[in-house]
UniProtKB/Swiss-Prot annotation:
Protein name: Leishmanolysin-like peptidase
GO molecular function, one term: peptidase activity
Record EC number: 3.4.24.-
PANTHER family in the record: LEISHMANOLYSIN-LIKE PEPTIDASE (PTHR10942:SF0)
One of the protein's GO biological processes: gonad development
Organism: Drosophila pseudoobscura pseudoobscura
Cofactor requirement: Zn(2+)
GO cellular component: cytoplasm; membrane
Amino acid sequence: MGLPPLQTQPGTFLVALGLCCWLLATANAHNCQHQHPKAHEVVHGVRIQLADSDDDDAAGSSDAAVHSVRRRSVTAEQPLRILLVYDDSVYRLEEEKFNLINDTVLPEAVQFWEQALMVRETKGIIRLNRKCDSTQVYVKNGHTHCIDQCKATTMCGEVQVPNEHLDVCRVCNATGQNCRIDSNTQPGDGIQNADFVFYVSARQTQRCFKGLTVAYAAHCQQEAALDRPIAGHANLCPESISTKPQELQTLISTVKHEILHALGFSVSLYAFFRDDEGRPRTPRKSETGKPFLNEKLQIHQWSNETIRKVVRENWSVRGGHVNKEVDMMVTPRVVAEARAHFDCDKLEGAELEDQGGEGTALTHWEKRILENEAMTGTHTQSPVFSRITLALMEDSGWYRANYSMATPLSWGKGLGCSFAMRSCKDWIQMNHARGRSIHPFCSKVKQDPLQTECTDDRNSVALCNLIRHDYELPKSYQNFDSLQNVKSGEEGFYGGSVSLADHCPYIQEFTWRSKNIIVRGSHCRFVENNPKPEKNFALESYGHGSKCFDHSEAMWEERSCHQTREWQHWGSGCYKYTCFDGRLHILVGNYTYKCSFPGQKLSIRIAANGWLHKGAIMCPPCHELCGSHFAAQGKQCRPGEEADPLNKYPRDNLACGAESRQQRSVAIISAALLLAAGLRLGHS
C-alpha cells in the first residue's frame, strides 16, 4: 500500500511516518454462522422430570406437560444450570488459547446466562435419546422409538455424545409393532444437576473459513414436556481465537451469542414457543404433537402469534419509494420492550434480519435499527445484550429473565417511530432539513484525509463507514439522492460498509492494521490501544476513565527545532477526564484543561517526546460526562461562563537556538526541492 500524500505547509520539512503505512479499517465484523438444525436433525422427546411434577413417566404426556407449565406461577424458578462437556479437540488447542477459553471465556459466558435466565428446575437425571437411522419414529407411552435400530453413535454437532449420557435404544418394527428396548443397550449414568448440557469442540471446520467466524452453535435435543432445548453444541474456530486483551470482551460476547442460539434464539425453535400458560403459540399436528413443517426451510413453521410479516409502504430510497416487507417478532414482552426502547407506541414488535441467507436472516435482530445489540448477525462494535433479547427468551415460555443482567442499549433509544419504522434515508433527510443531528447515521464519505469523530456514548474514536462500493447497490439499499463531493449519478455506488444494516452508513469503531494484523483498536477504555509515544501526535490517553473528545477542524501539528509534520488523519481522540468544582476537566499530557462552556475550543500546546504538539480539543456539554457524577453528590454542572484568559492555560514553547533555526530553514528548502523533483520524476 503506497503512502498517502502528507499535508504540506510553506517552508515545512515533512517526514513519512510509520503510522501512515497502517490501514485504518472499520472494526472486525465477527459474523455469526449459526446454521440452524433441520427438523430431522433434532432429537425430540427427551423425558425429564420437572420439579413439583409427579414422576418421570408423566413428563412425556401432553396433559402432564400443560399441568407442569401452568403451575409456573406458584413454583419458584431456579437459575439455569449449564453443564459444559469438552470434546478432545478442545484440549488440543494451543496452551494460551486453551487457558483463555477454559479459564475466562466459557466460564464468563456460561455464568452470564445462568444469572440472566431462570428455568423450571430439572429434577433427577437427564438421559438423552439415541439418534435413529430413519427420520421416521414412533412414540409409544411417551417414549421415542426408532424403526428397527438406533444409530451406532449419537452426535451433537461435531461432538459424539458419550454413552454414559444416553438412554437405552427403543425400537419398533416398520409398522409400529413389536416395540421394545434393544437388549444390546444399557442406560448410561446420565447427567445430574443440570438443565442444559453443552458439548464444546474446537475444530477448524469448513464453516470456520466463512467470513470471520469465531464460533457457531445450535441445539440438538429437546425435552418432551415443554419442547425446551436440553442439549446443544458449540464449535470454536481455533484460528480465529484472539488472545489480545482488547479483543477479549468481543470474544466473550460472541460465545454468549452462540450459546443463546442453542438456548432458544433460533429460527428452528420459534415454532415451539409457548405462552405463559404453557399453551403452544403455534398450532400442533394432532398425530405428532409437533408444528407443521416448512418443506422449503426444513424447519417447523411458526404462527403469526410469534412472527408476523408487515409491509412498510412508501419506504424512501434514492429517487423514490418502494414497499418493504419486514418480519417482526410480535410476542408480548418483545413488543412492550421494543416500543419502550424506541418510544414508539405503534411499533408492531422487534424487526428481524432480512439479509444474510440461511443462518443469519430471521435468526438475528435487524442490524439497521439495533446495530450493536449482541444478537444482530454481525458484531461490529461494543455488543450488548439488551432487554429486548431477554424479553424474547422469556416469551419462549421456557425461561424467566433477570432483566438486571441486561445492558442499556443506546442505539435508537428514544428516537421514535420515524427511526424504527422508516428508512435511514428518511431519517437522514428529515433531520438534515431540520438542522438536527443525523446520528446514529452519518453522511461523510470515508476517504483521505481521514477525519474521525466520536461515538454518541463517547466510548470510542470512530469513522463514518460510508464508502464507495465497486458495484451499484440494489435499489432498496440506495440511501442518498446526493452526496457532497460525489458526482451526480454515482450516488448508487455509495453506502455503508455493513450490508446487514441495509447499507445505512453509521459511526463505527475501527482498528489500525499492519500487514492485516491488528495493531490496536479505537475503543477508549483499553490501555492496549494507546499509540506508541513516537506516534501519539494528539497526546491521547487510552484506558480506564478515558472518553472520546472531538478535535477542532484543523489538523494537529508536531514541531521540533528541525521539522514540522502534520498527520494524515485527525478529528477526535481519547483522553482522561475528571469532574470537580461543577466543571468538566480534560487531561492532556501532564496538564489539566477546564471546560467553561459547551463548544469551547481548548488550545493545546505541549512539549512531549521531543516535539511540540499543537492542536485543539472541543469541550462537550458538562452533563454528558459529569452529570451523573455530580448528581450522586447532590450537585450539578455549573452554568456556562466566559473561559479563563489564554495565559491561564498551559502553553509550552520550543527552545531552539539561532543555529538550530538556520539548520531548520536549510532542511526545509532542501526537502521541498527533493519532494518537487520526486513528483516530477514520478510523472515523467
